[in-house]
Amino acid sequence: MPPATDPEIPAVTAPQKNKYLCLTILGYKKEGMTEEAYRNHMLNVSAPMTKDLMVKYGIRRWTMIHNQTPTRALMTQLFDSQMVNLAPYDCFSQVVFESIEDYKKIKLDPWYRKYLVGDHENFADTKRSEMTIGWIEEFVRDGQLVEGFEGEYV
């Protein structure tokens, strides 16, 4: 697989019609923090501080998926010859936007820099957490077939 800076891979900066980027943060909780304290901080401290900023800069959707011990245990019911590896992350946070510029504006916002950057150190293991970004492709929404992320029902 070519590196992300490969000259054969075109740069993506402008919004694509009916296409949305999804930044996925594969998060680990801060060492010594319980699962419940981590989830509580993200839901009741971090999210309230972040969501208005996301709206301000045109973010389309932001979700968190907390992978606590009881839900991870459910995976034993799904394991088979192909699904055998349980992801070790404590949370997946997904941010959906039209252009990379939308998210870059958040990171440049003075309020973000003053309050949110420091808050991450209160609950997240920022040295172990990982990120990736890609296009969202949606096929089923609310039990209905769809064409594209915000496309028409088929």
UniProtKB/Swiss-Prot annotation:
Keyword line: Lyase
Pathway: Secondary metabolite biosynthesis
Family of this protein: Belongs to the tpcK family.
Gene induction: Expression is positively regulated by the cluster-specific transcription factor MYCFIDRAFT_198930 and is up-regulated during banana leaves infection.
Stated name of the protein: Decarboxylase MYCFIDRAFT_34057
Class of this enzyme: lyase
Organism of this sequence: Pseudocercospora fijiensis (strain CIRAD86)
SUPFAM superfamilies found in the cross-reference section: Dimeric alpha+beta barrel (SSF54909)
One Pfam family from the record: EthD
GO MF terms, alphabetically ordered: lyase activity; oxidoreductase activity
InterPro entries xrefs: Dimeric_a/b-barrel, EthD_dom
Protein's UniProt keywords contain Lyase: yes
Catalysed reactions listed for this entry: atrochrysone carboxylate + H(+) = atrochrysone + CO2
UniProt KW Oxidoreductase keyword: no
Described purpose of this protein according to its UniProt entry: Decarboxylase; part of the gene cluster that mediates the biosynthesis of an emodin derivative that may be involved in black Sigatoka disease of banana. The pathway begins with the synthesis of atrochrysone thioester by the polyketide synthase PKS8-1. The atrochrysone carboxyl ACP thioesterase MYCFIDRAFT_190111 then breaks the thioester bond and releases the atrochrysone carboxylic acid from PKS8-1.
EC number, UniProt record: 4.1.1.-
